[in-house]
Amino acid sequence: MNANALRVLEYDKLKELLAKQTASSLGAQFVRKMEPAEDFEQVKALLALTTEATTVYRLRDRYPFGGLTDVRSEVKRAEIGSVLSTSELLAVADVVYSGRQVKAFQERLHEDHPDLRLPALDSRIEQITKLVEIEQGIRHAIDDQGTVQDSASDKLRALRSQLRSLEGQVRSKIDGVLRNKSKMLSDAIVTMRNDRYCVPVKQEYRQAFGGIVHDQSASGATLFIEPQAVVAANNEIQEARLKERAEIERILAQLSALVGSVGDSLRINVDVLAELDFIMAKALYGHTIRAVEPRLNENRHIVLKEARHPFIPDDEVVPITVSLGGEFTSLVITGPNTGGKTVTLKTIGLLQLMVQSGLYVPAADETELSVFDAIYADIGDEQSIEQNLSTFSSHMTNIVSMMGKIDFMSLVLFDELGAGTDPTEGAALAIAILDEVKRRGARVAATTHYSELKAYGYNREGVVNASMEFDVESLSPTYRLLIGVPGRSNAFEISKRLGLEDRVIDAARDQVGTDAQSVETMIGRLEEAKQRAESLERELLQEQQRLVEEREEFEREQAEIHQEKNEILAKAEEKATRAVERAQKEAEAVIKRLKELRDAGAVKEHELIEARKQLEQAKPSLQDQRIAKVKAKTNQAPVFAKGEEVKVTTFNQKGYIINQNSNGEYTVQVGIMKVNVKPSDLAKVGEVKSASKTKKRSGGTSITKQSAASAELDLRGVRVEEGLAKLDRFMDQALLSNYEQIRVIHGLGTGAMRQGVQEYLRGNRHVKTHRLGGQGEGGHGVTIIELK
């Protein structure tokens, strides 16, 4: 990528802001090495990584990188046999811990969101090795302050125990010296000199006190003397300390060797964690600047919607909407300086650099960007967003360098093209340069204040004029980009509002040609027309948004109604189920009492009639529920013949079938109307009459007794619903008659009646077993039932 373009578009400042989002110096190093990619597939992959990181941040948070430092040099030293210090070993343990935490974080994320797909991040995290043994070994041996702990080895524990014992003996002896020779001492304290216990003795008692002098005070009045009584014990302490140091050195060497043995894995861990920190920083920066993922295309098409320059504060920035590379390949922004033209160029250039670096861009949805091999920018030397200090020479030197490289895969940005020289020559040069760049197929955006270029967009195919809006009332620019409208100088209007006399302004107008005045007038009208159009567009968008919100509110209300309906149905079903269970228990109680009376031989006719009446009263809801459940399970939709009389249950009217439609519905003539009705909303008139007659009969089912232990029910030619009602009554009477086995003849046919009978029997608690008939019993056209 062109170095000058990176400089003038302030790419380094972008990297500084991005580096602030990293959690480690390693992540910041990745940011500092970041460069825009020039390959389309590579840019796609970079954006995919940012998208996955954004998803992770949205669902949970950033990865836990605590303790991540660059330990690669320490690992290399360990590999060649060097002994690492305790702080260096702790840094290694921290890196291992960080990797383990990131892996655990990713695993929990997938557990919480089983359908989540993060292929790019997962492939990187899979490379991290947990290295639990390394981490545990270091933590077991070294505490958080970097001290080797007693638990590091049995030998170290024993040596330190010996040290504590010896130090206790020395202190005990010195305490005696402090008591017995207190007048010789400058102070009654014990101090350490050269790792030996000493006491402060006055200079004049040097000979009387004895012992070994190790130090003296700055004034020389006090000597720090090791009492003779503790010399031997101090020697033992020194020997023990030497052994302690040797054991600590051995432990550190052992841990360092362990680190060196997994050097490759540790380096991979560091590299992966650093890259993850860098990727997550992109997601966090995008969140900070309210960025969106842009669409990516391969046709060098730029579409910015409400784009904002990321360095300008939100309360100051004015979003721009601009398209380049579709209908128009060149954009020429005209008008006076200080109107925001340079900011527009920098916004286009910097957002293109951002997307090619895998960053989201601060813009609205539907923003679209492409991938360019090179971006060239001539925005002057040392120019900031607020200033333009370039000269003609510096401009032209840069342009000459650019022109030797520009091709159809380039994005070119010219600021104040042709400025700094004679206006006529400068304008002519600007037009020639724009024509040449356009001829090469590059995408170009240029700014100029030359009025000669106002007509350029109208005279060249693929070129569009634009200008920065200026508020004449407030005498200040609005920084809004107006596409399709060339810029005006507004010099006369501004001068008039500032108080210049009308006759002076009129004289100035006379100096300007009629054609130039006409052009300015035309531009003014274009600006007004565009503002009216934009105002109308905003109103339409607001109305559209209102309609969308109303529709969403309507859909929410519909969903609430549907949910309420389902809750009511669920409660009703629960209530019906309880009623069925209650009826079942009542029926069982009646049957049990009848059996007890029959077995006792004490049943009388009027008692039997009364018990049967109770059974019939308890039965209907249970019977209806059983039939409904079996009907639902068999999925047996009623079939109607053409001309058959039916009842439309939805509005309780009779009619007759005209025909059946391809979607399964029936066309029914009801009075003077023809209606299309679902089969489930139709009932046979004969069936309704039959049902009403059945209710009036209490014992209409006939049981043919074949022997003392069998009975038979013939259901051939009967519809499923009617047959199940008969079977229900038949079962009750069979139980009252104390039958042990019964037969139900349902025939073969379509199998619907057989399936219905099987479903009914599976839900009946009085049935011990049931099976299809065997050879000589009627085969599959008969069901044999044994009762409990």
Curated annotation (Swiss-Prot):
Single GO BP term: negative regulation of DNA recombination
Smr domain boundaries: 713-788
Pfam families in alphabetical order: MSSS, MutS_V, Smr
Stretches with biased composition (Polar residues): 699-708
Residues covered by region (Disordered): 688-708
SUPFAM superfamilies found in the cross-reference section: DNA repair protein MutS, domain III, P-loop containing nucleoside triphosphate hydrolases, SMR domain-like
Known EC number: 3.1.-.-, 3.6.4.-
Molecular function per GO: ATP binding; ATP hydrolysis activity; ATP-dependent DNA damage sensor activity; endonuclease activity; mismatched DNA binding; ribosomal large subunit binding; rRNA binding
Organism domain of life: Bacteria
Residues binding ATP: 335-342
Gene3D superfamilies associated with the record: 3.30.1370.110, P-loop containing nucleotide triphosphate hydrolases
Signal peptide: none
The keyword Nucleotide-binding belongs to this UniProt entry's keyword annotation: yes
Keywords linked to the UniProt accession: ATP-binding, DNA-binding, Endonuclease, Hydrolase, Nuclease, Nucleotide-binding, RNA-binding, rRNA-binding
Family as reported in the entry's similarity comment: Belongs to the DNA mismatch repair MutS family. MutS2 subfamily.
Subunit structure: Homodimer. Binds to stalled ribosomes, contacting rRNA.
Role: Endonuclease that is involved in the suppression of homologous recombination and thus may have a key role in the control of bacterial genetic diversity. Acts as a ribosome collision sensor, splitting the ribosome into its 2 subunits. Detects stalled/collided 70S ribosomes which it binds and splits by an ATP-hydrolysis driven conformational change. Acts upstream of the ribosome quality control system (RQC), a ribosome-associated complex that mediates the extraction of incompletely synthesized nascent chains from stalled ribosomes and their subsequent degradation. Probably generates substrates for RQC.
Name the record gives this protein: Endonuclease MutS2
Annotated source species: Exiguobacterium sibiricum (strain DSM 17290 / CCUG 55495 / CIP 109462 / JCM 13490 / 255-15)
